[in-house]
């Protein structure tokens, strides 16, 4: 090949290489622009401080994917790509914050669960954030509400009071989850405002927490899951005191494989003389729980404290239902939900750690938390101490 041909070939190759480089740089720039545009539209949640204890970060990263997979299995949902958003806090209108950290769990780009890290046992409530032991819990708590505005260029504060949970955005306060209290008005917009002190504290935070996917994904594994056969969520408690009625109905329907039981009918059986108007105010006492179970052919007995993981595992295998009895840590005598009852649905091992899966009658989904935690941080920002169990439904 003569020198002119060589030069021509070299020039052609050079032009091709330069063109490819320009195209690749353009693609890289467009990709970065797409990422920047995507992140610019991400929802941001205001926090007083973006500092999170290292043990909280580590626990969240280690546990979130396994928890999400286990909960998906309970609802027969397909698993997907799980990612963890950044931690956020929930505040009262006067600026007080609770002792928990919340993370959005994102599956295939959609917020599906909320991971909550809260004090593990009652003794931890008096410890500092750095010293306390944390329990990890997952549920669908406000996940759908966050997902609805995830891709908006929004900046919100998550607030709570006795009526429920709110999103504050541009000075407007909107109720997103109402508490199960009688005569609770489920107003879409509230006249409440954030206290000036909280506004000032939120302004001092350099970076609000972002609801966006993190790159690092842990390969959490669900080694074992044992579920009470035939358990289904058929109803939900709201403005009544029938938590034990709901729990007993759900457990008996599961262990008898029927749709016969419901909370209203159980409460009507326990209070035959009470009017329909007054029935929602009737609660259930331990002796009634035992007697009703016996009337349905079940040998019910009370057991103090939290049953061991192995006991739950065996009872669940034997198709025997367990009802959780819990008491509010606040001990407020005016609280209509001072005591609460829940149903144990399953147990699991996630990354070799023992977990319990339960149903809170206030919710339409299940929750998972550590099996050795006696403190239940429930969906309405209330801490309950699991003090005993009714076994045998």
Swiss-Prot record:
Post-translational note: Proteolytically cleaved by staphylococcal serine protease (SspA).
Pfam families attached to this UniProt entry: Peptidase_C47, Staphopain_pro
Subcellular location: Secreted
GO biological process: proteolysis
Assigned EC number: 3.4.22.-
Major subcellular location class: secreted
One Gene Ontology CC term in the entry: extracellular region
InterPro entries: Cystatin_sf, Papain-like_cys_pep_sf, Peptidase_C47, Staphopain_pro, Staphopain_pro_sf
Propeptide regions on this chain: 37-219
Enzyme class: hydrolase
Quaternary context: In the cytoplasm, prematurely activated/folded SspB forms a stable non-covalent complex with SspC.
UniProt function note: Cysteine protease that plays an important role in the inhibition of host innate immune response. Degrades host elastin, fibrogen, fibronectin and kininogen. Blocks phagocytosis of opsonised S.aureus by neutrophils and monocytes by inducing their death in a proteolytic activity-dependent manner. Decreases surface expression of the 'don't eat me' signal CD31 on neutrophils. Cleaves host galectin-3/LGALS3, thereby inhibiting the neutrophil-activating ability of the lectin.
Protein name from the UniProt record: Staphopain B
Gene name in the database record: sspB
């Amino acid at each position: 090949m003569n020198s002119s041909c060589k030069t021509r070939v070299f020039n052609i190759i050079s032009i091709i290489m330069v063109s490819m480089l320009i195209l690749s740089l353009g693609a890289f720039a467009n990709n970065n622009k797409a990422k920047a545009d995507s992140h610019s539209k991400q929802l941001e949640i205001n926090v007083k401080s973006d500092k999170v204890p290292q043990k909280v970060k580590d626990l969240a990263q280690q546990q979130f994917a396994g928890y999400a997979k286990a909960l998906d299995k309970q609802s027969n949902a397909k698993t997907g790509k799980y990612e963890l958003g950044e931690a956020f806090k929930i505040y009262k209108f006067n600026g007080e914050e609770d002792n928990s950290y919340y993370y959005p769990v994102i599956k295939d780009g959609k917020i599906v669960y909320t991971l909550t890290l809260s004090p593990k046992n009652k003794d931890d409530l008096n410890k500092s954030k750095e010293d306390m032991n944390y329990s990890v819990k997952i549920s669908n708590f406000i996940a759908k509400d966050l997902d609805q505005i995830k891709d908006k260029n929004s900046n919100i504060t998550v607030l709570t009071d006795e009526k429920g949970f709110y999103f504050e955005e541009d000075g407007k306060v909107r109720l997103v989850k109402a508490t199960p209290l009688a005569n609770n008005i489920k107003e879409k917009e509230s006249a409440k405002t954030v206290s000036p002190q909280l506004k000032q504290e939120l302004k001092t935070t350099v970076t609000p927490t972002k609801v966006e996917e993190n790159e690092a994904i842990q390969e959490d594994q669900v080694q074992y899951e044992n579920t009470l056969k035939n358990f289904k969520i058929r109803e939900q408690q709201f403005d009544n005191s029938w938590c034990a009625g709901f729990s007993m109905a759900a457990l008996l329907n599961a262990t008898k494989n029927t749709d016969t039981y419901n909370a209203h009918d159980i409460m009507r059986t326990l209070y035959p003389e009470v009017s329909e108007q007054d029935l929602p105010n009737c609660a259930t006492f331990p002796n009634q729980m035992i007697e009703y179970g016996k009337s349905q052919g079940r040998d019910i007995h009370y057991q103090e404290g939290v049953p061991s993981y192995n006991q739950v595992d065996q009872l669940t295998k034997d198709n025997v239902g367990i009802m959780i009895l819990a008491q509010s840590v606040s001990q407020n005598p005016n609280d209509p939900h001072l005591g609460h009852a829940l149903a144990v649905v399953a147990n699991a091992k996630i990354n070799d750690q023992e977990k319990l899966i339960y149903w809170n009658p206030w919710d339409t989904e299940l929750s998972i938390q550590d099996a050795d935690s006696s403190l239940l941080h429930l969906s309405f920002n209330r801490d309950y101490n699991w003090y005993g169990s009714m076994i045998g439904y």
